[in-house]
């Protein structure tokens, strides 16, 4: 497995690795996320999952639905709900673009990466995506296999 360069400007908390396999990502954008105090502490401890979540535009606002943030053990009184809907923060222009994108047939909003930026703010990268069919997934897998095989051949034979 090849090493990936790590960007010192942000720390990845959770990544939706299935998203790039299940969806064809057309465009992505960074959103802020409204969190409670215990949620931020839980994220810093690394307890989250965005693999089964999605974003939805409702009544002119963008929401992250079904994302999991583990309960923070030291929070006695102000505990948060693990799978509550969380509001995402985007500009009005970006909101209009997202709404127009979701109105097209087959388009959806998929969370890709949840991270802390260089200022320590929790951010989430949302992708405007179209679901792949099974044959598309097989084609992509075949291309990846072929490129790996080419790299091995070049490495072995010079």
UniProtKB/Swiss-Prot annotation:
Keywords of this entry: Cytoplasm, RNA-binding
Keyword Ribonucleoprotein among record annotations: no
Keyword Calcium annotated: no
Localisation per UniProt entry: Cytoplasm
GO biological process, one term: trans-translation
GO cellular component: cytosol
Basic and acidic residues compositional bias, start-end: 136-158
One GO MF term attached to the UniProt entry: RNA binding
PROSITE patterns listed in its UniProt record: SSRP
Region (Disordered): 130-158
Family per similarity comment: Belongs to the SmpB family.
Function in brief: Required for rescue of stalled ribosomes mediated by trans-translation. Binds to transfer-messenger RNA (tmRNA), required for stable association of tmRNA with ribosomes. tmRNA and SmpB together mimic tRNA shape, replacing the anticodon stem-loop with SmpB. tmRNA is encoded by the ssrA gene; the 2 termini fold to resemble tRNA(Ala) and it encodes a 'tag peptide', a short internal open reading frame. During trans-translation Ala-aminoacylated tmRNA acts like a tRNA, entering the A-site of stalled ribosomes, displacing the stalled mRNA.
Protein name listed in UniProt: SsrA-binding protein
Source species: Ruegeria sp. (strain TM1040) (Silicibacter sp.)
Lineage: Bacteria, Pseudomonadati, Pseudomonadota, Alphaproteobacteria, Rhodobacterales
